[in-house]
From Swiss-Prot:
Organism: Rickettsia bellii (strain OSU 85-389)
Manganese keyword on record: no
Domain of life of the organism encoding this protein: Bacteria
Cofactors: Zn(2+)
Chain's role: Involved in base excision repair of DNA damaged by oxidation or by mutagenic agents. Acts as a DNA glycosylase that recognizes and removes damaged bases. Has a preference for oxidized purines, such as 7,8-dihydro-8-oxoguanine (8-oxoG). Has AP (apurinic/apyrimidinic) lyase activity and introduces nicks in the DNA strand. Cleaves the DNA backbone by beta-delta elimination to generate a single-strand break at the site of the removed base with both 3'- and 5'-phosphates.
UniProt keyword annotations, A-Z: DNA damage, DNA repair, DNA-binding, Glycosidase, Hydrolase, Lyase, Metal-binding, Multifunctional enzyme, Zinc, Zinc-finger
Subunit structure: Monomer.
Name of the protein: Formamidopyrimidine-DNA glycosylase
Family according to the record: Belongs to the FPG family.
């Protein structure tokens, strides 16, 4: 599933190309993605100017000048790409946004776990994103904040890192990578981390996410940016999907385990229990 760096990469690839354009027509090739698309979605955004493209957590947001926003979640396999006017719609292209410059913005989703909504812009944070915590790359993600969230939590730190009520945008890939960089065992309970470990973890999360954004995200299978280009952070992964291989830091073997049904990768030498 695309995480914060992938959605930020998508935002960066679309921002300068979409702002100022108008959506002239919306074509629904299929309206039952993860949830059924709203019948009035097209009416809320057609013939209005795009004024901003941004990200919140793992959501891409396109703001229009009529106080409506398009909210897109890529799910497991979603792609949101710009295509020329003569582009021929393919099997898993479910929504086509026809733009005023004669290009098409295509939402493609093989597994159909993606989501597209339209919502009042001014109500997004209050209502739609009401249960989301702060952004990990913000200055507010610091020692006292995370310490307060981990206090009394008898839950593995890997699970807590992926909890959107604590911090947003950190999924399976970047939780494993951040814990490895911080040298923290994924099974360690949140309540048992000391101040130095929490500070190291915050620094590791920021470091890993920032490097992944610079590399254009991680493409394991499906992810591409708005220009249909893959991400290259895959080449910098230290532990994720490297089970049985040598740790790039100490040469011990990378171990694969499970947390809440999700794969976790770590080095038992670098990340002692």
């Amino acid at each position: 599933m695309p995480e914060l760096p992938e959605v930020e990469t998508l935002k960066n690839s679309l921002e300068s190309k979409l702002i100022g354009l108008v959506i002239k027509k919306v074509e629904f090739k299929r309206d039952n993605l993860r949830y059924k698309l709203s019948a009035d979605l097209a009416d809320q955004i057609v013939n209005t100017n795009i004024i901003n493209v941004r990200r919140r957590a793992k959501y891409l947001i396109i703001d229009f000048n009529n106080n409506h926003s398009l909210i897109v979640h890529l799910g497991m396999s979603g792609r949101f790409t710009l295509q020329p006017n003569n582009y021929e719609v393919k099997k898993h292209d479910h929504v086509v946004f026809n733009l005023s410059n004669n290009e098409k913005l295509i939402f493609n989703d093989t597994r159909r776990f993606g989501m597209i909504y339209s919502f009042h812009t001014e109500l997004l944070e209050k209502d739609f994103f009401a249960n989301l915590a702060l952004e990990p790359l913000s200055d507010s993600f610091e020692l006292q904040y995370l310490k307060s969230k981990l206090m009394n939590k008898k839950v593995p730190i890997k699970n807590l890192l992926m909890d959107n009520r604590i911090v947003v945008g950190v999924g399976n890939i970047y939780a494993s990578e951040s814990l490895h960089l911080a040298k923290i065992h994924p099974d360690k309970f949140g309540k048992d981390l000391n101040d130095d470990e929490i500070k190291n973890l915050i620094a590791a999360v920021k470091n890993v996410l920032s490097k992944a954004i610079i590399a254009g995200g991680t493409t394991l299978k499906d992810f591409v940016n708005g220009d249909n280009k893959p991400g290259y952070f895959t080449q910098q992964l230290m532990v994720y999907a490297r089970d049985g291989q040598e740790c790039l830091s100490c040469s011990s073997s990378i171990i694969k385990t499970k947390h809440s049904g999700r794969s976790t990768f770590y080095c038992k030498s670098c990340q002692k229990a």
